[in-house]
Amino acid sequence: MSRKLLSLTALGAASLMALTACSGGTASSSQSSTSAAASSSSSAPSSVTIESDQGNVEIKLPVQRVASLDNRTFEVLAQWNVPLVAAPKKLIPSTIKAYNTDSVADIGMHRDPNLEALAASNPDLIISGQRFTRFDSQIAEMNPGVPMINLEPRDGKPLNEELIRPVNDLGEIFGHQEDAKKLVDDFNNALNRAKKAYDGKSTVMAVDVSGGNIGYVAPSKGRTWGPIFDLLGLKPALEVQGSTDSHTGDDISVEAIAQANPDWIFVLDRDAAISKDGSYTPAQSVIDGNAALKNITALTKGQTVYAPNDTYTNESIITYTEILNSI
Protein backbone atom coordinates (compact mmCIF):
# COMPACT_ATOMS: atom_id res chain seq x y z
CA MET A 1 0.00 0.00 0.00
CA SER A 2 1.31 3.40 -0.92
CA ARG A 3 2.29 5.92 1.69
CA LYS A 4 -0.34 8.33 0.26
CA LEU A 5 -3.14 5.79 0.69
CA LEU A 6 -2.07 5.06 4.24
CA SER A 7 -2.17 8.74 5.06
CA LEU A 8 -5.69 9.11 3.64
CA THR A 9 -6.86 6.07 5.59
CA ALA A 10 -5.43 7.42 8.82
CA LEU A 11 -7.00 10.82 8.16
CA GLY A 12 -10.42 9.24 7.60
CA ALA A 13 -10.18 7.24 10.81
CA ALA A 14 -9.16 10.31 12.76
CA SER A 15 -12.05 12.29 11.28
CA LEU A 16 -14.51 9.53 12.19
CA MET A 17 -13.21 9.45 15.76
CA ALA A 18 -13.52 13.22 16.03
CA LEU A 19 -17.06 13.15 14.65
CA THR A 20 -18.02 10.40 17.06
CA ALA A 21 -16.56 12.36 19.97
CA CYS A 22 -18.47 15.49 18.94
CA SER A 23 -21.67 13.51 18.56
CA GLY A 24 -21.17 11.95 21.97
CA GLY A 25 -20.55 15.35 23.53
CA THR A 26 -23.76 16.73 22.03
CA ALA A 27 -25.77 13.78 23.28
CA SER A 28 -24.22 14.12 26.71
CA SER A 29 -25.02 17.84 26.76
CA SER A 30 -28.58 17.16 25.65
CA GLN A 31 -29.02 14.51 28.32
CA SER A 32 -27.66 16.89 30.97
CA SER A 33 -30.07 19.61 29.85
CA THR A 34 -33.01 17.21 29.94
CA SER A 35 -32.00 15.97 33.38
CA ALA A 36 -31.72 19.54 34.68
CA ALA A 37 -35.17 20.41 33.35
CA ALA A 38 -36.64 17.27 34.90
CA SER A 39 -34.94 18.06 38.18
CA SER A 40 -36.29 21.61 38.11
CA SER A 41 -39.80 20.34 37.36
CA SER A 42 -39.65 17.74 40.11
CA SER A 43 -38.43 20.33 42.62
CA ALA A 44 -41.48 22.58 42.03
CA PRO A 45 -44.00 22.07 44.85
CA SER A 46 -47.13 20.13 43.95
CA SER A 47 -49.20 21.82 46.64
CA VAL A 48 -49.12 24.54 49.28
CA THR A 49 -50.96 24.80 52.58
CA ILE A 50 -52.42 28.20 53.43
CA GLU A 51 -53.65 29.30 56.85
CA SER A 52 -57.09 30.63 55.93
CA ASP A 53 -59.29 32.35 58.50
CA GLN A 54 -61.31 29.13 58.72
CA GLY A 55 -58.30 26.83 59.07
CA ASN A 56 -55.56 25.30 56.96
CA VAL A 57 -56.36 24.76 53.28
CA GLU A 58 -54.27 22.62 50.92
CA ILE A 59 -54.08 23.94 47.36
CA LYS A 60 -52.81 21.85 44.46
CA LEU A 61 -50.31 23.61 42.23
CA PRO A 62 -50.22 25.09 39.73
CA VAL A 63 -53.53 26.89 40.07
CA GLN A 64 -55.13 27.39 36.65
CA ARG A 65 -58.59 28.88 37.23
CA VAL A 66 -58.83 31.50 39.96
CA ALA A 67 -61.99 33.19 41.17
CA SER A 68 -61.44 36.12 43.52
CA LEU A 69 -64.18 37.84 45.51
CA ASP A 70 -61.88 39.90 47.76
CA ASN A 71 -61.34 43.40 46.37
CA ARG A 72 -58.08 43.66 48.33
CA THR A 73 -56.53 41.11 45.98
CA PHE A 74 -57.35 42.58 42.58
CA GLU A 75 -54.50 45.07 42.24
CA VAL A 76 -51.91 42.57 43.49
CA LEU A 77 -53.10 39.80 41.17
CA ALA A 78 -53.26 42.20 38.23
CA GLN A 79 -49.67 43.30 38.85
CA TRP A 80 -48.62 39.65 38.76
CA ASN A 81 -50.62 38.97 35.57
CA VAL A 82 -52.73 36.33 37.30
CA PRO A 83 -55.87 35.71 35.20
CA LEU A 84 -59.30 35.34 36.82
CA VAL A 85 -62.26 33.27 35.69
CA ALA A 86 -64.79 35.02 37.95
CA ALA A 87 -65.05 38.16 40.08
CA PRO A 88 -67.57 40.76 41.27
CA LYS A 89 -66.73 43.12 38.41
CA LYS A 90 -68.46 46.19 39.82
CA LEU A 91 -66.26 45.94 42.91
CA ILE A 92 -63.05 45.93 40.90
CA PRO A 93 -61.51 49.41 41.16
CA SER A 94 -61.81 51.43 37.96
CA THR A 95 -58.03 51.85 38.09
CA ILE A 96 -57.60 48.13 37.35
CA LYS A 97 -58.36 47.22 33.73
CA ALA A 98 -56.99 43.67 33.56
CA TYR A 99 -60.28 41.95 34.43
CA ASN A 100 -62.64 44.09 32.39
CA THR A 101 -63.03 41.35 29.78
CA ASP A 102 -65.70 38.85 28.73
CA SER A 103 -63.44 35.99 29.83
CA VAL A 104 -64.09 36.93 33.47
CA ALA A 105 -67.55 35.87 34.68
CA ASP A 106 -69.36 38.56 36.69
CA ILE A 107 -70.82 37.21 39.91
CA GLY A 108 -72.52 40.50 40.75
CA MET A 109 -72.51 42.55 43.92
CA HIS A 110 -72.34 41.18 47.44
CA ARG A 111 -75.91 42.28 48.19
CA ASP A 112 -77.31 39.72 45.74
CA PRO A 113 -74.45 37.68 44.25
CA ASN A 114 -74.83 35.27 41.36
CA LEU A 115 -73.18 32.30 43.01
CA GLU A 116 -74.34 30.04 40.18
CA ALA A 117 -72.13 32.02 37.80
CA LEU A 118 -69.23 31.48 40.19
CA ALA A 119 -69.75 27.71 40.18
CA ALA A 120 -70.22 27.66 36.40
CA SER A 121 -66.81 29.30 35.93
CA ASN A 122 -65.31 26.01 37.17
CA PRO A 123 -62.63 27.50 39.46
CA ASP A 124 -59.86 25.44 41.00
CA LEU A 125 -59.31 28.09 43.68
CA ILE A 126 -61.74 30.57 45.25
CA ILE A 127 -60.42 33.58 47.14
CA SER A 128 -63.18 34.90 49.37
CA GLY A 129 -63.12 37.74 51.88
CA GLN A 130 -64.50 41.05 53.08
CA ARG A 131 -67.92 41.72 51.50
CA PHE A 132 -68.43 38.06 50.51
CA THR A 133 -67.38 36.40 53.77
CA ARG A 134 -70.98 35.78 54.84
CA PHE A 135 -71.52 33.60 51.76
CA ASP A 136 -68.56 31.28 52.42
CA SER A 137 -70.64 28.30 53.57
CA GLN A 138 -72.96 28.55 50.58
CA ILE A 139 -70.04 28.94 48.18
CA ALA A 140 -68.35 25.86 49.64
CA GLU A 141 -71.53 23.81 49.22
CA MET A 142 -71.88 24.86 45.58
CA ASN A 143 -68.23 24.15 44.77
CA PRO A 144 -67.43 20.80 46.44
CA GLY A 145 -63.77 19.88 46.44
CA VAL A 146 -62.64 23.35 45.37
CA PRO A 147 -60.23 24.91 47.87
CA MET A 148 -61.41 28.26 49.22
CA ILE A 149 -59.33 30.67 51.26
CA ASN A 150 -60.45 33.72 53.20
CA LEU A 151 -57.67 36.11 54.19
CA GLU A 152 -59.87 38.80 55.74
CA PRO A 153 -57.99 40.77 58.43
CA ARG A 154 -58.63 39.05 61.74
CA ASP A 155 -60.07 40.88 64.72
CA GLY A 156 -57.52 41.94 67.29
CA LYS A 157 -54.57 41.58 64.92
CA PRO A 158 -52.40 44.57 63.90
CA LEU A 159 -53.32 45.92 60.48
CA ASN A 160 -49.76 45.73 59.17
CA GLU A 161 -49.57 42.00 59.91
CA GLU A 162 -52.98 41.41 58.31
CA LEU A 163 -51.98 43.28 55.15
CA ILE A 164 -48.71 41.38 54.85
CA ARG A 165 -50.16 37.91 55.49
CA PRO A 166 -52.37 37.63 52.38
CA VAL A 167 -49.69 39.04 50.08
CA ASN A 168 -47.18 36.45 51.22
CA ASP A 169 -49.78 33.69 50.90
CA LEU A 170 -50.71 34.77 47.38
CA GLY A 171 -47.02 34.87 46.53
CA GLU A 172 -46.66 31.24 47.60
CA ILE A 173 -49.73 30.15 45.64
CA PHE A 174 -48.78 31.85 42.38
CA GLY A 175 -44.99 31.58 42.56
CA HIS A 176 -44.48 35.31 43.09
CA GLN A 177 -42.57 35.16 46.35
CA GLU A 178 -40.05 37.81 45.28
CA ASP A 179 -42.79 40.14 44.07
CA ALA A 180 -44.62 39.66 47.35
CA LYS A 181 -41.45 40.50 49.27
CA LYS A 182 -41.10 43.70 47.26
CA LEU A 183 -44.65 44.77 48.11
CA VAL A 184 -44.06 44.01 51.79
CA ASP A 185 -40.75 45.88 51.83
CA ASP A 186 -42.36 48.90 50.17
CA PHE A 187 -45.15 48.86 52.75
CA ASN A 188 -42.79 48.52 55.72
CA ASN A 189 -40.62 51.34 54.42
CA ALA A 190 -43.67 53.58 54.04
CA LEU A 191 -44.86 52.66 57.54
CA ASN A 192 -41.48 53.43 59.11
CA ARG A 193 -41.25 56.73 57.23
CA ALA A 194 -44.72 57.80 58.41
CA LYS A 195 -43.92 56.87 62.01
CA LYS A 196 -40.81 59.03 61.92
CA ALA A 197 -42.70 61.90 60.28
CA TYR A 198 -45.35 62.12 63.02
CA ASP A 199 -44.36 64.44 65.86
CA GLY A 200 -46.38 62.56 68.49
CA LYS A 201 -48.49 65.54 69.55
CA SER A 202 -50.38 66.87 66.53
CA THR A 203 -54.09 66.02 66.68
CA VAL A 204 -55.71 64.10 63.85
CA MET A 205 -59.29 63.58 62.69
CA ALA A 206 -60.34 61.16 59.97
CA VAL A 207 -63.50 61.62 57.93
CA ASP A 208 -65.42 59.82 55.19
CA VAL A 209 -67.10 61.96 52.54
CA SER A 210 -70.10 60.31 50.89
CA GLY A 211 -72.98 61.93 49.04
CA GLY A 212 -71.67 65.36 49.94
CA ASN A 213 -71.86 64.53 53.67
CA ILE A 214 -68.92 64.35 56.06
CA GLY A 215 -68.86 61.32 58.37
CA TYR A 216 -66.63 60.71 61.38
CA VAL A 217 -64.12 57.86 61.09
CA ALA A 218 -63.36 56.51 64.54
CA PRO A 219 -59.79 55.74 65.62
CA SER A 220 -59.00 52.01 65.61
CA LYS A 221 -62.34 50.82 64.20
CA GLY A 222 -63.34 53.27 61.45
CA ARG A 223 -63.09 52.45 57.74
CA THR A 224 -59.57 52.54 56.24
CA TRP A 225 -58.20 55.31 58.46
CA GLY A 226 -59.19 53.81 61.82
CA PRO A 227 -56.32 51.30 62.08
CA ILE A 228 -53.84 53.96 60.90
CA PHE A 229 -54.28 55.69 64.28
CA ASP A 230 -52.97 52.55 65.98
CA LEU A 231 -50.18 51.91 63.48
CA LEU A 232 -48.75 55.42 63.83
CA GLY A 233 -49.79 56.20 67.40
CA LEU A 234 -51.82 59.22 66.28
CA LYS A 235 -53.48 61.53 68.80
CA PRO A 236 -57.22 61.83 68.04
CA ALA A 237 -58.62 65.35 67.86
CA LEU A 238 -62.01 63.97 68.92
CA GLU A 239 -63.30 60.67 70.26
CA VAL A 240 -67.00 59.94 69.90
CA GLN A 241 -68.77 57.48 72.16
CA GLY A 242 -70.57 54.63 70.43
CA SER A 243 -68.62 55.03 67.20
CA THR A 244 -68.82 52.30 64.56
CA ASP A 245 -67.07 51.00 61.44
CA SER A 246 -69.80 52.34 59.16
CA HIS A 247 -68.87 52.46 55.48
CA THR A 248 -69.96 56.11 55.36
CA GLY A 249 -68.61 57.13 58.75
CA ASP A 250 -70.63 58.12 61.81
CA ASP A 251 -72.83 61.19 61.97
CA ILE A 252 -71.03 64.33 63.05
CA SER A 253 -71.69 68.02 62.60
CA VAL A 254 -69.18 70.28 60.90
CA GLU A 255 -69.44 72.48 63.99
CA ALA A 256 -68.13 69.59 66.12
CA ILE A 257 -65.23 69.16 63.72
CA ALA A 258 -64.48 72.88 63.84
CA GLN A 259 -64.61 72.87 67.64
CA ALA A 260 -62.18 69.94 67.79
CA ASN A 261 -59.88 71.96 65.48
CA PRO A 262 -57.66 69.10 64.30
CA ASP A 263 -54.11 69.81 63.22
CA TRP A 264 -54.53 67.22 60.48
CA ILE A 265 -57.54 65.81 58.65
CA PHE A 266 -57.38 62.46 56.86
CA VAL A 267 -60.08 62.02 54.21
CA LEU A 268 -61.63 59.00 52.50
CA ASP A 269 -63.59 59.91 49.35
CA ARG A 270 -66.09 57.06 49.09
CA ASP A 271 -67.91 58.49 46.09
CA ALA A 272 -64.69 58.72 44.08
CA ALA A 273 -64.48 54.93 44.14
CA ILE A 274 -68.10 54.01 43.47
CA SER A 275 -69.51 56.83 41.32
CA LYS A 276 -69.22 57.37 37.60
CA ASP A 277 -66.86 60.11 36.48
CA GLY A 278 -68.32 63.53 37.10
CA SER A 279 -71.44 62.27 38.87
CA TYR A 280 -70.36 63.26 42.38
CA THR A 281 -68.86 66.14 44.32
CA PRO A 282 -65.21 65.40 45.14
CA ALA A 283 -64.36 65.20 48.84
CA GLN A 284 -61.85 68.01 48.54
CA SER A 285 -64.57 70.34 47.23
CA VAL A 286 -66.84 69.34 50.12
CA ILE A 287 -64.13 69.96 52.72
CA ASP A 288 -62.66 73.14 51.25
CA GLY A 289 -66.07 74.57 50.43
CA ASN A 290 -67.51 74.26 53.93
CA ALA A 291 -67.52 77.66 55.63
CA ALA A 292 -67.55 76.14 59.13
CA LEU A 293 -64.22 74.42 58.47
CA LYS A 294 -62.28 77.15 56.72
CA ASN A 295 -60.45 78.35 59.84
CA ILE A 296 -59.43 75.01 61.36
CA THR A 297 -55.70 74.39 61.62
CA ALA A 298 -55.71 71.47 59.19
CA LEU A 299 -57.06 73.66 56.39
CA THR A 300 -55.21 76.88 57.13
CA LYS A 301 -51.90 74.98 57.20
CA GLY A 302 -52.71 72.74 54.25
CA GLN A 303 -52.52 69.62 56.41
CA THR A 304 -55.24 67.55 54.76
CA VAL A 305 -54.43 64.07 53.47
CA TYR A 306 -56.68 62.42 50.89
CA ALA A 307 -56.60 58.67 50.37
CA PRO A 308 -56.27 57.53 46.73
CA ASN A 309 -59.57 57.80 44.86
CA ASP A 310 -59.99 54.02 44.52
CA THR A 311 -59.34 53.28 48.19
CA TYR A 312 -62.90 52.34 49.14
CA THR A 313 -62.97 49.50 46.59
CA ASN A 314 -59.27 48.66 46.80
CA GLU A 315 -57.72 48.73 50.28
CA SER A 316 -54.85 46.48 49.22
CA ILE A 317 -51.38 46.65 50.71
CA ILE A 318 -50.49 48.81 47.70
CA THR A 319 -53.18 51.32 48.65
CA TYR A 320 -51.97 51.51 52.24
CA THR A 321 -48.41 52.01 51.03
CA GLU A 322 -49.61 54.99 48.99
CA ILE A 323 -51.56 56.34 51.97
CA LEU A 324 -48.60 56.08 54.33
CA ASN A 325 -46.31 57.72 51.81
CA SER A 326 -48.71 60.67 51.58
CA ILE A 327 -48.72 61.39 55.33
Give the role of each language-model region.
Residues N56, P144-G212, Q303, D310-I327:
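Extracytoplasmic substrate-binding proteins
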Residues S2-A13, A18-R72, Q177-V209, L268-Y280, ...:
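Bacterial Sec-exported substrate-binding components of ABC uptake systems
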Residues Y198, G211-Y216, L234, D245-I274:
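Ligand-binding pocket segment of bilobal, Venus flytrap-like solute-binding proteins
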Residues L91-T95, A218-T248:
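Alpha-helical, coiled-coil/dimerization segments enriched in small aliphatic residues
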Residues D263-I327:
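Structured C-terminal subdomain patch of bacterial secreted/periplasmic proteins
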Residues N122-S128, P144, I257, N261-F266:
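Proline-aspartate-enriched helix->loop->beta-strand connector
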Residues R65, D70-A117, L125, R131:
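A short, structured surface patch at a secondary-structure boundary
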Residues S52-Q54, I107-N114, S243-I252:
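Short helix-initiation/N-cap motifs at beta->coil->alpha
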